C-alpha cells in the first residue's frame, strides 16, 4: 500500500503543467454542452406528452371497437384526435379517433370507464421559453464565449488570427552548430561574434561596444543562410524564435501588424533572445510598389515591423536575423543601421570552401579508396552548398541502387552529371537519322570550343537525352570566375552557333530547324548585354542603355520613362547584330576548316554516345578510344511524336558552370 501511495505521489510530482489553451477549450466545450442539455430538459419538461407511458401500443380503430364489444377494454381517455387507455390485461394502447357520435353510447353499454381531455393549448410560459428565452440565452452564451476568446488572444483578430506564428526552438530540436558549417568562413565569423556577445556581453560593453540589433543574411539560393541561423540557435543558448516572412500576411486586414506586435511581445518576455525571419522579402518589399493602392496589408505589416525593430520603444536584448536572396527589393528603411546593422554576404563557395563542404557532407557516407574530394571540388565551380549536398546524396543513392557497399568516384561523376545536365532519359528512343543529327549538332559545339581561344575547356559531350535536351555539350571553367572579359564573351557567341552551322554544313540549308532556338536566345541576350550594360560597343561607348526591365511590383517601372531615342535604339540593334554575325562567322570558319574533324567526332558520338573532353580530343585526332564501353544502338522510331532536334538547357547566367549547346 505504501509503495502504491509513493508511486502515485511520484507521478503527481512528475506531471507537466497542462496547456492553459487546452484547458480553455475544454471549459468552452463543457459550457456549450451544458447549454444544450438545459435546452433539451426544458423542452422535455414543457412537452405535453411527457407523462405518457412509453410502452403504448398503436392499434387500429376497428380492433379497438372489437375489443369494446368483447368487453376487452378497461378504460378509455378521449382526446381531440386520439383515443388512449388500457385493455383488461392492463396493456396500454392508443388509436386515432374518427368523428364517431355513437362511441360514447357503445362505451356506456359495455360499462367501460372513460374520460375526455380538453383541446391542447400552449401555455404562455411555454411560448415565452421556446420562442424567446431559449434563443436569447443561446445567442448571449455564444457572444460571451466569442468575447472571452477575443480577450484571450489579446484583441489580435478573430479566434487567434492575430497571434504570432513564430516557433520557439529548443536546443534539442534539429541542433546544428557552427562545426556543421563550412565554406563560408567570413559569414560564420560575423555571426559567431553575435553569439559571443550574448554569452559574454561585458567583453564588448566595457569598451563601449553595443550588440548589433540585427543582421541580414544575403546570398544566392542554397548557400546556407538558413543553416547559419539554425547554427546560431544551437550555439547561442538563448530563446530562438523562427518565422517565415509569408507567415505575417493573411486575408484579414490588420492581422499582419497584430502578429508582428505579438511576436515582439513574446520576445520581450524571453529577452535576451533572437528572432529569425526567413525570406523577409515576402513582407519587407519596397513600399509604394505596384500599380494599385500602395497602402495594402503588406505595407501595414512592414510599417509595424519597422516600428518594433527601432521605434519609440527600445527593444533591449532582442536580435533580429533575416535571410533573403533578393536584397534589391527590400525597403531602404529596413536596411538602415539601427534595424539591420550588418549585412552578411553568404556567397557561393570557392574551391577550398567546396572541399570543406563536401567533407562535411561525406562524414556519414562510406567512401571507396578512389574517391578524391579535391577533384570533385575542382570540377564543381559555381556550385552552392545545397548543390554539393545534392551531389553527395545522389551518389549515395546511385551506389545503393547498384548494390554497392562503398560510394566510388564513378558514382560522384554520374551524380555531378545528373545535377548539372539532368537525368538520363534513355526511354526516349531516337531513330538513326535523329541520333546522327544530334551528334553533328553537339560535335559542332564541341569542335568550336576546342579551336576558339577563350572558350571554357570541354568537359563532356553526349547525345543521350538529359533533362529537356536531346544532347548536351558541357564546358567547365578551370577555376571560379568572378568576371568575364570581352574575348571570352565573343568566344561564347561563336560557341552558341556551332551546332546549327555544323548541321548546315552536313545537311544543307534546308536542314534549318527549331532545335537551335535556345542557342539563338543565349547569343542574343549576351550580345545585347555586351552593348547595353557592359559598354563593349565602340560605337556606343561606355554608357548604360539597358531598357527598363524592372518588375512592375517594385514600383519603379511605372514612373520611369525610356531614356533612349529611336536613333540610339536602332544603333543598339545594329551593334547587337554585328556581334551575333561575328560569332556566327567565326564558328562557320572553324567548322569549315576542320570539317574532317567534325565527321570523326560525330561518328565517335554515334558509337559511344558520351565522350569526355580528353576522349573527344582523341576522337578528333583519329586515335582509338578504349576506355568506353560501347552501348547498343536502337533504331526504333521516336515515340510520342517528340522532335528529334536537340535543344539545350536554359542558360544559367554568365560566369557560372552551365552546359552549353544543343
Curated annotation (Swiss-Prot):
**Which Gene Ontology BP terms does the record give?**
protein catabolic process; proteolysis
User: Where does the record place it?
Assistant: Cell inner membrane
Cofactor requirements of the protein: Zn(2+)
Signal peptide interval: none
Give the UniProt keywords, A-Z. ATP-binding, Cell inner membrane, Cell membrane, Hydrolase, Membrane, Metal-binding, Metalloprotease, Nucleotide-binding, Protease, Transmembrane, Transmembrane helix, Zinc
What's an example GO cellular component term for this entry?
Answer: plasma membrane
Q: Which residues lie on this side of the membrane: Periplasmic?
A: 49-126
Q: Which residues bind Zn(2+)?
A: 441, 445, 519
The membrane topology of this protein is:
Multi-pass membrane protein
Annotated transmembrane regions: 28-48, 127-147
Q: How is the cofactor bound?
A: Binds 1 zinc ion per subunit.
Q: Any keyword Disulfide bond?
A: no
UniProt-annotated catalytic positions: 442
- Listed EC numbers: 3.4.24.-
GO MF annotation: an example? zinc ion binding
Q: Does the keyword Mitochondrion apply?
A: no
Segments on the Cytoplasmic face: 1-27, 148-662
Task: State the function annotated in the UniProt record.
Answer: Acts as a processive, ATP-dependent zinc metallopeptidase for both cytoplasmic and membrane proteins. Plays a role in the quality control of integral membrane proteins.
Homology family: In the central section; belongs to the AAA ATPase family. In the C-terminal section; belongs to the peptidase M41 family.
Subunit notes for this chain?
Answer: Homohexamer.
Q: What is this protein called?
A: ATP-dependent zinc metalloprotease FtsH
Please tell me the species this chain comes from: Zymomonas mobilis subsp. mobilis (strain NCIMB 11163 / B70)
Amino acid at each position: 500500500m505504501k509503495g502504491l501511495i509513493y508511486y502515485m505521489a511520484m507521478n503527481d510530482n512528475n506531471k507537466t503543467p497542462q496547456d492553459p489553451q487546452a484547458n480553455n477549450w475544454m471549459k468552452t466545450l463543457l459550457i456549450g454542452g451544458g447549454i444544450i442539455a438545459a435546452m433539451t430538459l426544458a423542452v422535455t419538461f414543457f412537452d405535453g406528452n411527457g407523462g405518457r407511458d412509453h410502452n403504448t401500443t398503436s392499434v387500429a380503430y376497428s380492433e379497438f371497437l372489437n375489443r369494446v364489444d368483447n368487453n376487452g377494454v378497461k378504460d378509455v381517455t378521449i382526446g381531440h384526435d386520439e383515443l388512449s387507455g388500457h385493455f383488461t390485461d392492463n396493456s396500454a394502447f392508443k388509436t386515432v379517433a374518427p368523428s364517431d357520435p355513437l362511441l360514447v353510447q357503445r362505451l356506456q353499454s359495455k360499462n367501460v370507464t372513460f374520460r375526455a381531455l380538453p383541446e391542447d393549448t400552449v401555455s404562455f410560459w411555454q411560448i415565452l421559453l421556446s420562442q424567446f428565452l431559449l434563443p436569447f440565452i443561446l445567442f448571449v452564451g455564444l457572444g460571451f464565449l466569442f468575447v472571452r476568446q477575443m480577450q484571450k488572444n489579446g484583441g489580435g483578430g478573430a479566434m487567434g488570427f492575430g497571434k504570432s506564428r513564430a516557433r520557439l526552438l529548443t536546443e534539442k530540436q534539429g541542433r546544428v552548430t557552427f562545426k556543421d558549417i563550412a565554406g563560408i568562413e567570413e559569414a560564420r565569423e560575423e555571426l559567431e561574434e553575435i553569439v559571443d556577445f550574448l554569452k559574454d556581453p561585458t567583453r564588448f560593453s566595457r569598451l563601449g561596444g553595443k550588440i548589433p540589433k540585427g543582421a541580414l543574411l544575403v546570398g544566392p539560393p542554397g548557400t546556407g543562410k538558413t543553416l547559419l541561423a539554425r547554427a546560431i540557435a544551437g550555439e547561442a543558448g538563448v530563446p530562438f524564435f523562427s518565422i517565415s516572412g509569408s507567415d505575417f500576411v493573411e486575408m484579414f486586414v490588420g492581422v499582419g501588424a497584430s502578429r508582428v506586435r505579438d511576436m515582439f511581445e513574446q520576445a520581450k518576455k524571453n529577452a535576451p533572445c533572437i528572432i529569425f525571419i526567413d525570406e523577409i522579402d515576402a513582407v519587407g518589399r519596397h513600399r509604394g510598389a505596384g500599380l494599385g493602392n500602395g497602402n495594402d496589408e503588406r505595407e501595414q505589416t512592414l510599417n509595424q515591423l519597422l516600428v518594433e525593430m527601432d521605434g519609440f520603444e527600445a527593444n533591449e536584448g532582442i536580435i533580429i536575423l533575416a535571410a533573403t536572396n533578393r536584397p534589391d527589393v527590400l525597403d531602404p528603411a529596413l536596411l538602415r543601421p539601427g534595424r539591420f546593422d550588418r549585412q552578411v554576404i553568404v556567397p557561393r563557395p570557392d574551391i577550398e570552401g567546396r572541399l570543406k563542404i563536401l567533407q562535411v557532407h561525406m562524414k556519414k557516407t562510406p567512401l571507396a579508396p578512389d574517391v578524391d574530394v579535391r577533384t570533385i571540388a575542382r570540377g564543381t565551380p559555381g556550385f552552392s552548398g545545397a548543390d554539393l549536398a545534392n551531389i553527395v546524396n545522389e551518389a549515395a543513392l546511385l551506389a545503393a541502387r547498384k548494390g554497392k557497399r562503398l560510394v566510388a568516384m564513378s558514382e560522384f561523376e554520374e551524380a555531378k552529371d545528373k545535377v548539372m545536365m539532368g537525368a538520363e532519359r534513355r526511354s526516349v528512343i531516337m531513330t538513326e537519322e535523329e541520333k546522327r543529327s544530334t551528334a553533328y549538332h553537339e560535335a559542332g559545339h564541341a569542335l568550336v570550343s576546342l579551336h576558339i581561344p577563350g572558350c571554357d575547356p570541354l568537359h563532356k559531350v553526349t547525345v543521350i537525352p538529359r533533362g529537356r535536351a536531346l544532347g548536351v555539350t558541357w564546358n567547365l571553367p578551370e577555376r571560379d570566375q568572378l568576371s568575364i572579359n570581352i574575348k571570352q564573351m565573343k568566344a561564347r557567341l561563336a560557341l552558341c552557333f556551332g551546332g546549327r552551322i555544323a548541321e548546315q554544313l552536313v545537311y544543307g540549308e534546308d536542314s534549318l530547324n527549331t532545335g537551335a532556338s535556345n542557342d539563338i536566345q543565349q547569343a542574343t541576350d549576351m550580345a545585347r548585354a555586351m552593348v547595353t550594360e557592359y559598354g563593349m560597343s565602340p560605337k556606343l561607348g561606355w554608357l548604360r542603355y539597358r531598357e527598363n526591365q524592372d518588375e512592375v511590383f517594385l514600383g519603379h517601372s511605372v514612373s520611369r520613362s525610356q531614356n533612349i531615342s529611336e536613333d540610339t535604339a536602332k544603333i543598339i540593334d545594329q551593334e547587337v547584330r554585328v556581334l551575333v554575325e561575328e560569332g556566327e562567322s567565326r564558328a562557320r570558319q572553324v567548322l569549315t576548316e576542320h570539317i574532317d574533324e567534325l565527321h570523326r567526332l560525330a561518328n565517335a558520338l554515334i558509337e559511344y554516345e558520351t565522350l569526355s573532353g580528353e576522349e573527344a580530343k582523341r576522337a578528333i585526332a583519329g586515335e582509338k578510344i578504349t576506355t568506353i564501353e560501347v552501348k547498343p544502338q536502337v533504331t526504333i522510331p521516336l515515340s510520342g511524336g517528340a522532335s528529334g532536334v536537340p535543344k539545350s538547357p536554359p542558360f544559367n547566367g554568365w560566369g557560372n558552370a552551365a552546359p552549353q549547346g544543343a
